[in-house]
């Protein structure tokens, strides 16, 4: 049913979710891809003072107003989005992959942390992950973050900021990464689907740094039982985002490590999180896996 937000209210949504409302509803897209649909009347981009056409994609950080004599539907067209809105509205969820719930679930067991972005819980699911963010997730999935944070070993990379020095030093000492050049890690470069899938294969002991060609990492992950065929296709079909890092990491936890139990079993045994905390985190996600 319809609800009223008397002040701007924020929601993190997933693909296919719809926010709708009548005349007077104001909407700001804080992140992600969203379009607007309406059959009559007008929707105004208040930021530019212009009307937008039905079916148009909306610009981030512009304020949109549903004008007279219409009801507008704001639909999430990307994997995720963050909307801020004020006025009379209804939210209609779609049965799509719930990346936001997976991010929240991983946060409860300390495997995923937000950035200092002031919206969307800092999850930044709409952004491409950096190579450093991918490396830190690998270290967490290995259950080795506490060791990494106390590492004072040498690392040769000139482009690593102070806060990331322990992670880079630890990963270099353990042979987890060689950087993009002898003295460059590529800290702020985007991580690819192939790179992150290769990291997962290493965490699950199906690969190692001896594997230098990572171009077929998703396919190798499929043959190892780490990814489904649908997941390989999805990774190949769209830009790789932090939403995908969350998804792959979430399902890696229920995957068997080469020669042993599941990755979650390994992390529980290492004391990274408890069995009860893990079970509670899984209960937070109700969407289905991509087949």
For the regions a protein language model found, what residue spans apply to each?
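Ligand-binding loop in jelly-roll beta-barrel domains
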Residues: 66-82
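Conserved short histidine dyad/triad with adjacent acidic residue
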Residues: 10-21
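Extracellular beta-strand scaffolds
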Residues: 19, 34-36, 44, 52, ...
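Feature responds to low-complexity, polar/acidic, surface-exposed segments characteristic
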Residues: 81-165, 174-194, 200-239, 252-291
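Boundary at the C-terminal end of the N-terminal hydrophobic targeting segment
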Residues: 1-2
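Glycine- and acidic-residue-biased ligand/ion/polar-headgroup-sensing regions
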Residues: 24, 29-42, 48-49, 78-79
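Short acidic-glycine-tyrosine-enriched beta hairpin
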Residues: 46-61
């Amino acid at each position: 049913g319809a609800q009223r937000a008397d002040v701007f209210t924020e929601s993190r949504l997933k693909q296919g979710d719809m926010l709708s409302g009548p005349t007077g509803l104001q909407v700001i897209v804080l992140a992600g891809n969203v379009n607007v649909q309406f059959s009559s009347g007008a929707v105004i981009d208040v930021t530019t003072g212009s009307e937008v056409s039905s079916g148009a994609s909306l610009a981030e950080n512009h304020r949109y107003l549903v004008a007279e004599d219409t009801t507008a539907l704001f639909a999430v067209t990307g994997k995720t989005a963050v909307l801020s809105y004020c006025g009379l509205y209804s939210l209609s969820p779609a049965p799509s992959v719930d990346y936001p719930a997976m991010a929240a679930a991983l946060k409860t067991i300390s495997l995923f942390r937000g950035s200092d972005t002031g919206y969307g819980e800092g999850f930044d699911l709409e952004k491409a992950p950096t190579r450093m963010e991918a490396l830190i997730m690998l270290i967490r999935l290995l259950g080795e973050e506490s060791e990494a944070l106390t590492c004072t070993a040498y690392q040769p990379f000139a482009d690593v900021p102070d806060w990331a020095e322990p992670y880079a030093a630890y990963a270099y000492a353990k042979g987890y990464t060689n950087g993009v050049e002898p003295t460059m890690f590529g800290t702020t470069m985007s991580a690819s689907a192939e790179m992150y899938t290769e990291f997962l294969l290493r965490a699950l002991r199906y690969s190692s740094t001896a594997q230098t060609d990572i171009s077929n990492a998703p396919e190798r992950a499929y043959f190892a039982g780490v990814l489904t065929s649908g997941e390989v296709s999805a990774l190949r079909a769209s830009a790789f985002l932090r939403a995908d890092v969350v998804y792959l990491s979430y399902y890696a936890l229920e995957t068997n490590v080469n020669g042993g139990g599941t990755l979650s079993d390994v992390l529980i045994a290492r004391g990274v999180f408890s069995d009860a905390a893990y079970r509670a985190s899984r209960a937070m996600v109700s969407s289905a896996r991509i087949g």
